[in-house]
Amino acid sequence: MKIRHFQLATLAAAIAFSGIAAADITVYNGQHKEAAKAVTEAFTKETGIKVTLNSAKSEQLAGQLKEEGDKTPADVFYSEQTAPFAMLSEAGLLEPLSADTIKQTQHKGVPVAPKKDWIALSGRSRVVVYDKNKLSEKDMEKSVLDYATPKWKDKIGYVPTSGAFLEQVIAITKLKGEQVALNWLKGLKENGKLYAKNSVALQAVENGEVPAALINNYYWYALAKEKGEDKLNSRLYFIRHQDPGALVTYSGAAVLKGSKNKEEAKKFVDFLASKKGQEALVAVRAEYPLRTDVVSPFNMEPYAKLEAPEVSATTAQDKENANKLIEQAGLK
């Protein structure tokens, strides 16, 4: 009889243990791999939940998620931009997040998901990087629109395949109108130098191939940390005064409605918004933490001084229209 009781107790303990064992999760990752690796490793260390990262461009992953629908193997979508969330939210593929999770990164200027089904996590600023040996700050324009003019013929680099570039087109369209955005794109094609990546455009400025380029801030800060700011040939210019050239773009995350591991997925997104999660991210990447109690170790321009326009993609149509304009201008 004692043996029987022992067996039942052992079985009950095994069932109880299996019931609390956390499932592993799969993250479709459009964020930079270095940043994603840092936060997932910190999350696993904190919770014991293992994370599989499937990485590609955010827009590509969003398209894949729409095709997969509720049958997706993904639990979380971690995007470098917020624009892809609009399409997925409208398709009903995202799970609402708790108010406690969302409020961790909410403050003035940070985009809010209309259905509370994704969260902004970190920001990066659009900037002009320029060759300090050829240009000075007084040569810089007060609006990003003015870099697409004949004055800058062969003097300005740009990266039309960048997700942040797409969001800048959305910002120009919303703030200045569709025709202005199209004229800007055509002007860049006519007068600018096209590069495949932001890092390549930055290196072109460093090497003296082009005097200036439109990029994201963190590429320059990473290079400055690696080589030393005094060793660089380039400097950053911040356009400010709510111009679309001062745009801050945001990374974010969402739990997929088709996730088979929603509890663990929500824990992961909550961790990304937590102090530990934000600290893990900004330790390796010069992005702005959205928690006010986390400070970046990079010597970045203060977030409060960026004077960014409060504009972002809120519908799938915003993204679709921007892509059409880029294509119409002959840049796709």
Which residues make up each language-model segment?
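Periplasmic-binding protein-like
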Residues: 124, 152-159, 185-188, 192-195, 231-257, 271-294
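Extracytoplasmic ligand-binding site segments that recognize negatively charged/polar headgroups
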Residues: 30, 34, 73-210, 244
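Early extracytoplasmic/lumenal segment of secretory-pathway proteins
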Residues: 23-86, 332
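A bilobed periplasmic-binding-protein/Venus flytrap-type ligand-binding module shared by bacterial periplasmic
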Residues: 129-134, 173, 248-261, 280
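N-terminal signal peptide c-region/cleavage motif recognized by signal peptidases
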Residues: 16-20
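A ligand-binding cleft/hinge motif common to bilobed small-molecule-binding domains
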Residues: 83-87, 211-233
